[in-house]
UniProtKB/Swiss-Prot annotation:
Residues 1-27 form the signal peptide. Its main location: periplasm. This is Protein PapJ. One of its GO terms (cellular component) is periplasmic space. This protein maintains pilus integrity and thus is an important participant in pilus assembly. It may function as molecular chaperone directly or indirectly in the correct assembly of PapA subunits.
Length: 193
């Protein structure tokens, strides 16, 4: 089989071009790597407009779509119902939103539901140590299956009287302007399991 010289040169040029194009396209693929999520990686720090780092993403346990938030910053202190004992105070109902996945009600499985417990803390300074006398009795444990629910806290009678006295004093003195100087402020500490 005799091949023309010009045809052989054209075949060699086409073969070298296809090899070059194939190598060029594969080189582009080699530069792409899988973006694996690592919670403590430095690339997950947020950078502000001045080039400073403002925070980091920290993950532990099961990653949920959103943490719980209070629907309102105000919690009404109701009068003690007659059917409660003298030792127990009136329950405080805290409406929460955005808990868990916020989807339809699903059976409690790991990764779907979330167990929440919390406590109300009195006194100024969110970073201060939680002394036993400054911590109200714990809120009920509940399993959250939906995106909207409530947390029920039951202060005892002594703590309820203390809250009522603080509310009365703050109302008379008009000290609602500065949250740090107002000892009547309650802070909610929510723990996720």
């Amino acid at each position: 089989m005799v091949v023309n010289k010009t045809t052989a040169v054209l075949y060699l040029i086409a073969l070298s071009l296809s090899g070059f194009i194939h190598t060029f396209l594969r080189a582009e693929e080699r530069g792409i790597y899988d973006d694996v999520f690592t919670a403590d990686a430095l690339r997950h720090y947020r950078i502000n407009e001045r080039g400073g780092r403002t925070g980091s993403l920290t993950c532990s346990g099961a990653l949920l779509s959103s943490p719980c938030t209070l629907v309102s910053n105000e919690v009404p202190l109701s009068l003690r119902p007659e059917n409660h004992s003298a030792a127990a105070g009136a329950p405080l109902m805290l409406r929460l939103a955005g808990c868990g996945d916020g989807g339809a009600l699903q059976p409690g499985k790991r990764g779907v539901a979330m167990t929440v417990s919390g406590s109300l803390v009195t006194g100024p300074g969110s970073g201060s140590a939680l002394l036993p006398d400054r911590k109200l009795s714990g809120c009920d444990h509940l399993v959250i299956h939906d995106g909207d629910t409530f947390l029920l806290c039951r202060p005892d009678r002594r703590q309820e009287e203390m809250l009522a006295a603080w509310r009365k004093r703050a109302t008379q003195e008009g000290e609602y302007s500065d949250a740090r100087s107002n000892p009547a402020m309650l802070r909610l500490s929510i723990k996720y399991e």
